Amino acid sequence: MGHLYRFVEPVLLLVLKEKGRSYGYDLLRSLGEHAFTDGEIEKAVLYRTLRRLEQNRYIVSNWDTGAPGPARRVYALTKDGEKHLEEWAQVLAKVADSMKRFVRRASSGSFSSHYERSSV
């Protein structure tokens, strides 16, 4: 039911905090497990978000050439990234409260009873 691309950033930060270091394909798979969406996250969204996080110095990357096969870019969280994740946690706590209120109101049937009263 739709993509919440805005939340790719905090999920990436959390995954990197938990894993320490990770590469693109592994992050994409982890996003699917942790994301706030029922759809797949597009690769372009992942890499755009990683670039932005790196430009803002929330993550760093380097090329891993030690493993067999082609070199892979490996990402890691910085201290600034940890602080940014904490900020996201505070924002998401407020969003969660708002969502709970929304769900409660939307599922209470209050709209139909209000509509019926106002149409009389």
Where are the regions a protein language model picked out?
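Short beta-strand "wing" residues that participate in macromolecule-binding interfaces
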Residues: 61
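Amphipathic alpha-helical dimerization/coiled-coil segments
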Residues: 83-120
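Glycine-centered, phosphate/nucleic-acid-interacting loop/turn motifs that mediate DNA/RNA or nucleotide
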Residues: 57
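Basic, amphipathic "hinge/linker" alpha-helix immediately C-terminal to the N-terminal HTH DNA-binding motif
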Residues: 67, 71-89
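Short, hydrophobic-biased segments on the C-terminal half of alpha helices
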Residues: 47-51
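N-terminal helix-turn-helix DNA-binding core of bacterial DNA-binding proteins
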Residues: 2-45
